[in-house]
Amino acid sequence: MSDADVATEAPAALPGDGLREGIIDALRRDIGEGLVDTHLMPNDDLWIRVATDAWRAAAASLHAAGFDYFCYLSAIDWMPSPYGRGEDDPTQPPPERTTEIKQGYAGGETRFQMLARLTDTKRHVGVTLKADVPDDALAVDSWIPVYAGANWHERETHEMFGIGFNGHPDLRNIYLPTEFEGYPLRKD
């Protein structure tokens, strides 16, 4: 085969992923406009961003679709750290810091996002669910009615980030003293 033959061949198409594409389609049918964005890595992983008001409905839809294992639930503060990165050289002047927020796979529009990982143990497929949490209303609906195991995850997220969970029966602190002020995992 000559170099000319190689240059004229069409590039190979990326493989499809019918299983994960089907999950996206089913969730879109269930929550409609509540599905905001997706990031599919064929035959590897799936990230889905939903609207804040569709957070619990998305969990219920995925649970009904066979996602029987609740892995974790937490939040992330996408604000760039005012202290730099841990690998910055302390002997050098500090690098210029950016204030641009980058939300990772499936995008985002707010500083805080909820993250949760669910797995369908029969089909051996997982999905990471994300939801933007508006700065002026730091709360989402609790997942306890859908996944009872979300209880302490939500308590920890509330304690560390200050995000509320509508319908949660008991948002007492787990780690910090009752009189502790502030939220340790916020970057401000």
Feature locations, PLM:
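Terminal low-complexity/charged segments
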Residues: 1-188
